[in-house]
Amino acid sequence: MEKLTDLNYTLSVITLMNNTLHTILEDPGMAYFPYIASVLTVLFALHKASIPTMKIALKTSKCSYKVVKYCIVTIFNTLLKLAGYKEQITTKDEIEKQMDRVVKEMRRQLEMIDKLTTREIEQVELLKRIYDKLTVQTTGEIDMTKEINQKNVRTLEEWESGKNPYEPREVTAAM
């Protein structure tokens, strides 16, 4: 690990890359040299930047796995951005956070739907009571005795002797 952060080693790797690129460049059919050179430069820079960072992170952090995972994800996301991709790699922690946020929002919406449903049910019950009060209720026979002030009127069947007491009778007078 000491060798990776050594300046002489870095210079020898750069020299090796340059020699390799010059041998590739001598081939006249090599048209993609600038692209290969830029990719190799980026990879080497990431390699040189990530090794000391990872060493320090592993020594100082207690949760080294999370730090290493975060560094690797960050490196890959940087490479994807350099390649022109808009997608990014996410870790399980980020996915779990997003899922928790989605679940929380769904619970909030379900509570809102429950409240609205309860209100709608109450409104329907109120409208039913109002409708029941406004509907005309039919009864078999209407008692009109209170309206025409004839409470003591009897029918033919209700009279005791079976005769109408209001019919005129023959009256004989004694002299």
From Swiss-Prot:
Pfam families: Rota_NSP4. It is a single-pass type III membrane protein. Keywords: Activation of host autophagy by virus, Calcium, Enterotoxin, Glycoprotein, Host endoplasmic reticulum, Host membrane, Host-virus interaction, Ion channel, Ion transport, Membrane, Metal-binding, Secreted, Signal-anchor, Toxin, Transmembrane, Transmembrane helix, Transport, Viral ion channel, Virulence. GO terms for cellular component: extracellular region; host caveola; host cell rough endoplasmic reticulum membrane; membrane. It comes from the Viruses. Homotetramer. Interacts with the immature particle in the viroplasm. Interacts with host CAV1, early and late in infection. Interacts with host integrin ITGA1/ITGB1 heterodimer. Interacts with host integrin ITGA2/ITGB1 heterodimer. Interaction with microtubules blocks trafficking to the Golgi apparatus. Belongs to the rotavirus NSP4 family. Residues 1-28 are lumenal. The N-glycosyl content is primarily Man(9)GlcNAc, with a small amount of Man(8)GlcNAc. The keyword Transmembrane helix applies. Plays an essential role in the virus replication cycle by acting as a viroporin. Creates a pore in the host endoplasmic reticulum and as a consequence releases Ca(2+) in the cytoplasm of infected cell. In turn, high levels of cytoplasmic calcium trigger membrane trafficking and transport of viral ER-associated proteins to viroplasms, sites of viral genome replication and immature particle assembly. The secreted form acts as an enterotoxin that causes phospholipase C-dependent elevation of the intracellular calcium concentration in host intestinal mucosa cells. Increased concentration of intracellular calcium disrupts the cytoskeleton and the tight junctions, raising the paracellular permeability. Potentiates chloride ion secretion through a calcium ion-dependent signaling pathway, inducing age-dependent diarrhea. Binds 1 calcium ion per tetramer. Ca(2+) binds at E120, Q123. Residues 52-175 are cytoplasmic. This is Non-structural glycoprotein 4. GO terms for molecular function: channel activity; metal ion binding; toxin activity. Its main location: host cell. One of its GO terms (biological process) is monoatomic ion transmembrane transport.
